[in-house]
């Protein structure tokens, strides 16, 4: 019997290859969303991969003072796109969730909906892109809320090797996130191999 994505991630002898994608723009018609998903999966037809990652895109204009090269566009709910991709690809999906825009009660409702309506268990929670702007729920508070919630979640976190290169403390962040419930970590891309090696 094939191993689940959780089993592969948990087993240090298994390599895990994930493909990341973003949901289509908010307001995209259902039939067009289906076509986009099928086109993505057709491109991946010849690739051996273990699962898909669906990112939750947030407005990061508070992170930098200069104007972004591309304006922010809201996307469809990542849970909806995750559900569609899981159904079409018949592979496990990891769904990202940006937690800063909702307060604790809204986040608890979101967790309940995610378990009940979408049957999604593999989640990566991400915090605010910067300390500027409105933060309704911190990442640490979201981890606490999740720990007290009955939803069965396989929780992942984000590891940023470049942050380790500049601040030297990413390993401490990973240890803290592990203590807060993270069971695996994802690096979105390796821009600097040496920074990644140093972090590991």
Residue spans for each PLM region:
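Short catalytic-loop micro-motif centered on adjacent basic/acidic residues
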Residues: 94-97, 184-189
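A long, hydrophobic alpha-helical segment
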Residues: 184-185, 193, 197-198
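Active-site beta->alpha loop and helix N-cap motifs at the rims of alpha/beta catalytic domains
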Residues: 2-169
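Short, catalytically relevant binding-site loops at active-site mouths
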Residues: 162-164, 191-195
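C-terminal helical cap(s) of enzyme catalytic domains, especially alpha/beta-barrels
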Residues: 133-134, 196-200
């Amino acid at each position: 019997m094939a191993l689940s994505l959780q089993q592969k991630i948990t087993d240090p002898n298994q390599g895990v290859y994930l493909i990341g994608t973003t949901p289509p723009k908010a307001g995209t018609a259902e039939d067009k969303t289906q076509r986009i998903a099928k086109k993505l999966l057709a491109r991946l037809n010849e690739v051996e991969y273990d699962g898909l990652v669906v990112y939750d895109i947030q407005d990061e204009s508070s992170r930098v003072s200069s104007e972004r090269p591309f304006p922010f566009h809201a996307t469809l709910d990542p849970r909806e796109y995750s559900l569609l991709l899981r159904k079409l690809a018949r592979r496990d999906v990891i769904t990202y969730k940006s937690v800063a825009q909702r307060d604790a009660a809204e986040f608890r409702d979101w967790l309940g909906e995610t378990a009940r309506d979408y049957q999604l268990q593999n989640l990566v929670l991400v915090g605010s892109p910067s300390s500027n702007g409105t933060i309704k729920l911190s990442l640490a508070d979201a981890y606490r809320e999740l720990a007290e919630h009955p939803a069965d979640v396989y929780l992942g976190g984000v590891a940023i090797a470049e942050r380790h290169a500049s601040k030297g403390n990413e390993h401490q962040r990973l240890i803290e996130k592990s203590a807060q419930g993270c069971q695996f970590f994802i690096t979105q891309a390796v821009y600097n191999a040496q920074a990644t090696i140093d972090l590991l």
